[in-house]
């Protein structure tokens, strides 16, 4: 014991001399359990009783530290539990050190609570008095929940197996049927008193009485205490104080704060100057040092306060209840209905030691171990070991019940709103709505797992015959057909409005899913619906013609795509067009989908079907080019290289055209054997076709399966009137004011050949050509050009600048068209239809009205687009020639595709970068002298040098 007036040891290692002293007490030993909360490092709750553990003490969960003061009948049993901050920190560290296990706060909290309940149940059965220590200043309401769990655990578990298990042990005979010493009294010790209240006797007593009333009402309301000891979990004294506030002693002083306070007191200077009022009072004193005594009332009050501080201690507070137990009035002072036979059992030290050893083994030390399951065959005890913690986890059951309700609500909301067939975006939307319905009731730790379960259930419901195909169209719209049901053709349900090749008739087109459907089948179907498309003859672009049924899409090198086709032409293109940027090589190719016999993707919309426009194309046969030449990707470059060499650079206002002498007409028939064979580089493949559109880096000799461009003469130049613009019966769907072509005056100067043209062949020239040559070498060509844009709603409009929509005749200036043709035009532009959604219009047609002059207009469009910078061309070996005094329309592809993948249109265009989606390169027009000896209906079989000689405007 040393300098201390008490003994302390760890259970069950009781020293022999202490055991001898306890044996001398006989059956007058009162056991007091001290349990609750602590904040000190040693987890000590005995400081209020003036006791401390040894210096080398290490707190451990479930450890019992015994204290005994000689000369008393009180054995204090200190319980170290998870409510002590030191032990709670140890448990947190152990949990965090577990590898691969994330810290689950809810599960950790439930485990700590269950361990504390076990220790409380042990104290409930082996102690006469329980002292609950609280570090706060108010009663912790969560303690009521702990008492309820204790009552539930005792009534549903402990009472079921303790009587039978203790029956054959000495503890069973001593404890009786209730298996406990008595209904223990519970006392509440608050280590700290509120600083706002004064520490006088009246203030402290008032606070204690108020807290007692609150605790009594709570415990009575939840039936923790009743009028009968047999049905009460705990007991409260009727006429004695059971709440103690430590108002005078600082139990766990902070050494650092104390040092700071002492330092402040030492540094504080005492002001000894007396006030003026005090000096006036002192002048009335008969002599210096004269004072008046406080009087008898002050001395009595001061003595009573000192006496109250001396007697108001936790030890005196406890001993009043110990005396009730020793005097035998323990139950009488706690319950109104006193049992016939006294329940209080006062045991000697050895008997009590046997009882606590047996109960500690059953409730704490062996709980949850496999050995106890094998040794003790009691069924109720095995249930206790396996499901005790789970049965106390009422919060988990509560959250699980709420999540179960929320799960049903979420699944019901999903199924109720789900259509017959829907896609992934609709599934995600319905799932979000189901999650909101779940969150109306479901919450807590199991909510995440319940949402995952709901997600899996909804996914199974979606995949059970309700899943949409979702094959994306070329416009990124998903197919709406059922995924599990076979379907020959995809259908997104999105309908676009587009015009035919000539632009006269508009029709509904389904969202295309293949390049053939987008660029060929729709327009072939519209030919049957348009009375103008049926009459005109279109320029035939070169396409792939297989020699057998075994043909396939061309396969490109993965590492170096288009290397063989492009490495020679890149140098030529760099020489011919140094301003053009290098083309990036594509990385693959995509197979074209199977050809469908019927498309059924459109229906006529235009009211002009069958109108009174009965124009004949007789007399325009010379201008209708029907050519199928062998494909050469460098044809554009070759054509440029065969130009006359003179251009508008020689004059700011004139275009110089070098005239040649008329060719001598051979009257004799041509011998087929005398025709020179075409170069080997013009030979086209008959086994491999080009899967995409023709571009400048396409492999030599590869042709597409179908033409994606269209070039047609829709009538004479007199069809268009610049005063009225394009009429609705001829070109439908144009916005008001945006239906005018731009006039383009090209000043032309003819340069004759060195030889005189008045030779024997002169009579073979046409009269019109002779008239032009007679009337002078200078002429002005009147050309009308229009760049037409069309949106998916069928709105059509012309542009007067790359960033401006034509708004009528006021936007047409003298040099408007000249600037347009020499400027890159954006492939996409926002439609001015002012709809809610920002529809992008696409450059779909180029209108050209050729002049009445002995020249041919040449068209050589090049569309540059895609992140790989594809430059798409017509695919002809030589650019097509347009006949004189005619109205020509060049339709551009609806969808662009390179060798590897589709080039999708942009979702949105930035105003400062309208060329981001692609653009039509400037300088697509050229001019060449009309040669009456050439048959433009059969350009493919004419000499390349003859057709390719022109001057680029």
UniProtKB/Swiss-Prot annotation:
PANTHER family in the cross-refs: AMPLIFIED IN BREAST CANCER 2-RELATED, NONSENSE-MEDIATED MRNA DECAY FACTOR SMG8
Location of the region described as Disordered in the Swiss-Prot/TrEMBL record: 571-604, 629-653
Oxidoreductase found in the keyword field: no
Function: Involved in nonsense-mediated decay (NMD) of mRNAs containing premature stop codons. Probable component of kinase complex containing nonC and recruited to stalled ribosomes.
UniProt source species: Drosophila pseudoobscura pseudoobscura (Fruit fly)
Acidic residues bias locations: 573-586
Key word Cell membrane present: no
GO terms of biological process kind: nuclear-transcribed mRNA catabolic process, nonsense-mediated decay
Low complexity compositional bias, start-end: 634-653
Domain of life: Eukaryota
Keywords: Nonsense-mediated mRNA decay
Designated name of the protein: Nonsense-mediated mRNA decay factor SMG8
Family, similarity comment: Belongs to the SMG8 family.
UniProt biased composition (Polar residues): 595-604
SS bonds (residue pairs): none
Alphabetical list of InterPro entries matching this protein: SMG8-like
Pfam families in UniProt: Smg8_Smg9
